């Protein structure tokens, strides 16, 4: 199983990077760190006032901070999967289209690192 990541460099040229091996420890590291980020956010949300439906009223800035923290963590995590030092968090953030970045990063994490299969998601999707 090789992980593939296509990035655009500062000259506008594309380069595809491959990583042949990812240790199981990376899976565990991802699960732990994402849980810590999410738990921190959930603790914050529990302290917020709620609306008439009992849903927390989350300030936009706070939610955006959470999304940014999670997105930066995921970009850094994917960069650290690669042995090639050219693959960095900044290279990922600067070398991918916004419309593709989230899907590409999450595909690497979900399928290559965590081991989910696309068929698993298809079975869970409502029909």
List each language-model region with its residue ranges.
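C-terminal charged interaction modules
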Residues: 79-127
